[in-house]
Every structure is written in C-alpha cells, then in structure tokens.
Curated annotation (Swiss-Prot):
Assembly and oligomerization: Heteromultimer composed of HisG and HisZ subunits.
Protein name: ATP phosphoribosyltransferase
Taxonomic path: Bacteria, Bacillati, Actinomycetota, Rubrobacteria, Rubrobacterales
Main location: cytoplasm
Species for this entry: Rubrobacter xylanophilus (strain DSM 9941 / JCM 11954 / NBRC 16129 / PRD-1)
Gene Ontology cellular-component terms listed: cytoplasm
GO molecular function, one term: ATP phosphoribosyltransferase activity
Amino acid sequence: MRGLRIAVPKGAIFEDALRALEAAGLPAGALRGNGRRLFHRAGGVEFIVSRPSDVPVFVEHGAADVGIVGKDVLEEQEPNVMELVDLGSGACRMVLAAPRERASQVERAIAHAEVVRVATKFPRTARRYFEEMGRQAEVIELHGSVELAPLVGLSECIVDLTATGTTLRENDLEVLDEISRSTARLIANRGSYRLRHAEIRGLLASVGREGRPVGG
C-alpha cells in the first residue's frame, strides 16, 4: 500500500499547512524550496501541492487521503468529504463590499429587493447569501481581480474573501456585511478514513492539539 497522501494548498495558507503537518511529525518541510514541483515523496508520505480549490477534488475522489483547505472553499464547493479539524489558522472573512461613495445606494437597493449585480469568485456562496435574505442578485463569476469589477461598472458590489481588508481599502471598497468566517480545515476522503483509520486518526490526534474537532 502506498504512503498516506496529503493534499496541501498553494497560496495564503501554504505555510500554515506545512507548520501544522510538521507539528504532527510529518516531513512537510520537504515542500519548501521545491519550486514548481507538485508531487513529493518524503519519509513514507506523499504530498500533492495544488490550487486551494482543487484540494477537495483530490480528496473527494480518493487521489489524496487527506487535505488542508479553507472553510470558504468547502462552503463554496460542498464536497463529499469528512471535515475533521478546524486548524484555526489562515483566518479570513467572506464579505459583501461596494465602492465607498456608492455603498449606501447599494444597501438601499438590496433593502428594497432590487436586483443587484455581484462579482465574485464564489458564485454559490454569493447566490446562497442573497437567497437566504430573500433577495435577488445577478451573480457574475470572475477568476481574479474581483475588486476591479465595481470600479469599471461590471457590478455594483462584490462578494470576496479578505484577511486584513487592505486590498478593499486600497480600492476604496467598503464592507457592507460579513457573510462568514473561514479558517483552515483538515479534511479526509471517506473511504480512506475507513481503510487508513489508524494513520488518519494518528494525524488527527497530532494536529488536533492545535485545532478544534468539527463534525464530518
């Protein structure tokens, strides 16, 4: 049987993920300084380095046994995986934001049930947010530079992730509402959890010292 295979996200929570795995005694430090290499073997463990949005895909379909990913990705994709531990790192917020000079106008439009255009990288999250309020929105999916959309007239507002709010402030965007909060989570493939129960439970016990158990 191959070694335990772990999917690690590139980007903002990459270092947090490595620290959590290293704290669990895994040789995750081997992933540092390896440039574009996306598959690693070290100490009997296999690591996949992928885009955050792809981590749940690898885990759900069994290409990885476990993975680390932000709660925002899980809420957007709703994958069929086990969510084991809230690692508490990589904290950020999903927010509704609009240009500062038009913020009150957008708030009034939403309050009066007018259809607003919303740009986002999280279309399911955005639709769910407006549906739960009983409001309608035209959701425009983008894959980057969401902050630009209301500045050039593509949308009235955005739904996006922010950690410090710096990018929003730099683009004169004001937060209208906080939709949810996100931290890094340890997830597992359901089949792997049964077949590799001892390995995954051992990992869970180690990383769980720094995190909070959640439902699967």
